[in-house]
Amino acid sequence: MNSKEVTKGVARAPHRSLFYAMGYTPEDLKKPLIGIVNSHNEIIPGHFHLNEIVQAVKLGVASAGGTPIEIPSIGICDGISMNHSGMKYPLASRELIADSIEAMTIAHKFDALVLVGNCDKIVPGMLMGAARLNVPAIYVSGGPMLPGKLKGKKIDLVHGAFEAVGSYAEGILSDDDLNKIEQHSCPTCGSCAGLFTANSMNSLAEALGVALPGNGTIPAPYGRRKQLAKYAGVKIMELVKKKIKLRDILTKEAFKNAIALDMAIGGSSNTTLHLMAIAHEAKVYLTLEDFDEISRRIPHITKLSPAGTHHMVDLDEAGGISAVLKELMDANLIFKDQLTVTGKTLEENIKNSLVLNDSVIRPLNNPYSNEGGIAILRGNLAPDGAVVKQSAVEPEMLYHKGVARVFDGEELAFDAIMNKKIHPGDVVVIRYEGPKGCPGMREMLSPTAAIIGLGLEKSTALITDGRFSGGTRGPCIGHISPEASEGGPIALIEEGDLIEIDISNRRISLLVSPEELSKRKENWIQPPCKAPDGTYLKRYSKLVTSASTGAVLE
C-alpha cells in the first residue's frame, strides 16, 4: 500500500505523531488510507450539501475496513460567474483541481480516492487528477436539484431565470414576473435540474464505469443519494483489495460508451472538451472524429431541458442512465464487457434495467432524431472543428445563411442583443473568447438566453471560439478552432460577411474568397494577452491548447 510510506517503520515515527495529533489511532494507520476529496463550499448550490454526502462515504469506507481522510477541492459556480470577468476561471479551474488532487495524493500517500463533486468543471477536474495518478478511485456526485414550479409549469435556471432576462427586456415580463421566476427557478440544492454540463458529466461517469449506477440522476434531496455515497465507500475498499486502478476502467471502449450515451441523451457540448481532457490523462487517444463518428450512428432518445421539457428527476423515474444504456446495449451500440467500479462489467450492472416511461426514454425505433445530440462541423471557418448541440436546434435552423455581426468579446455582443441591434437572419460572431484569447474560454449563456428571450432563436445564429453552457439551446456553434487569438479564420471575419451553417452536412463556411482571406490574414495582428501579469490566467494562456484537443495544458 502507498500509505506504508507514511505509516510504517521507525523512520515514520514523526509522521505517525502528526496523525495522532488529529485523533487517528494506531489501528487506523494499519488500514488503507482513503482520500475523500470534498468540493463542498457555500457558493455553489450543487456543492452546498456535499458534507452530508461525504459523511455517508466515510461511513462506507470505515465499515469496509478503511480509514477515510477528507481533503478539500475548490469549486466554481458557472452560473454565478456567468456574463462577467469571473467566467474566465471555471474552465481554467479544471486544471487546478486536477493538479491539487495530484499534489495532495502523492504528498500524503493515499491508497485510493473517492471523489465527491457535482458541478461543471469539478467533475472532469477530479477525474483528470485521478486518471493521472492511476489509483483506485470512484466518483460520487451530489445529485441534481429538483425543478421549480410556477403557475403550474416546471422551470429551471435556464428555462426560467436566464431566459427571463431577454423576455423582460422585450417587455414580455413585468418586474413582479421576473421576481417570481428568479425565486422559483432553483428550489433545492443540487446541480441545476436540466441536462446541462454538470448532469451531463455526472451521467457520463456511469457510462465510463467510474461511478455507481444512479450517480447521474438520483436527485440531491433523496435518501437514495446518501445510500449511493455509502455504497461507494464500501466499493472503494473492494477496488483496493482487488488492485483495480482507474486506468483499468478508463479504456478507449469506455470513452466510446460515454460518447454513445452522450449522443443518446443529448448532453452538453462541453462534454467534448472534458472527455478528451480525461482521456488525455488516462493515456487514451480521443478526438473530435470519435464524437462525430459515434454521433452519426446513435439515435437521440431523450429530450431533457434545455432542449425539452423533462428534467433529471423525470429521467431518474423513467429508469435512469442504466435504462438508457440497456437500450443501447440491446442494440449492440456500446461495449458491454467494460470493467466498472462495481467490480463487475457494464452489462452486469445494467442487465436488469427497464425503461419505466417511454415518453421520457424513447425506444430506439422512435427517436427524436436518428443522429446523436452533438455534431462536429468543419469548413474554412473551422478547419480544426467546431461543436454544436444539434439536438437543441430547431429544424428550420439546421441550415442558415446570414450576415455576420462581429463582436470582439461577449460583453459587446450582449449589449447589442439587449439593445435590439441584432435582427432576424443575422449571425452573431463572438470572438477572442477561446482558451488562449479570453483566456479561459467563457460560456456564452447570457447572449444565447437573451436571443431566446427576444424570440430570435428561429432566425438568428451565434458562433464563437468560446463555448456554451449546457443550458444553451438554439443554433449556437462553439469551440471554433483555431481560435481568433491564434489567427484562426474567425479572426478574419468582417461585419457584413456572409456565413453559411449546414449542420446536417457538418459544414460551417465563411463565404469569402481564399484570396481575400489571405489578404486579411497578412494584415491581422495578434492582440496581447488580456490577463494581467502575475495571474494564474496569464500562466494558463501560455500553456493551454486548442479546444479541438480538449483545452488541456501542455
Curated annotation (Swiss-Prot):
Which prosthetic group or cofactor does it need? Answer: [2Fe-2S] cluster; Mg(2+)
Gene Ontology MF terms in the entry: 2 iron, 2 sulfur cluster binding; dihydroxy-acid dehydratase activity; magnesium ion binding
Which keywords label this protein? Answer: 2Fe-2S, Amino-acid biosynthesis, Branched-chain amino acid biosynthesis, Iron, Iron-sulfur, Lyase, Magnesium, Metal-binding
Q: List, from the UniProt record, the residues annotated as the active site of this protein.
A: S469
Function text: Functions in the biosynthesis of branched-chain amino acids. Catalyzes the dehydration of (2R,3R)-2,3-dihydroxy-3-methylpentanoate (2,3-dihydroxy-3-methylvalerate) into 2-oxo-3-methylpentanoate (2-oxo-3-methylvalerate) and of (2R)-2,3-dihydroxy-3-methylbutanoate (2,3-dihydroxyisovalerate) into 2-oxo-3-methylbutanoate (2-oxoisovalerate), the penultimate precursor to L-isoleucine and L-valine, respectively.
Q: Which family is it part of?
A: Belongs to the IlvD/Edd family.
Protein name according to UniProt? Dihydroxy-acid dehydratase
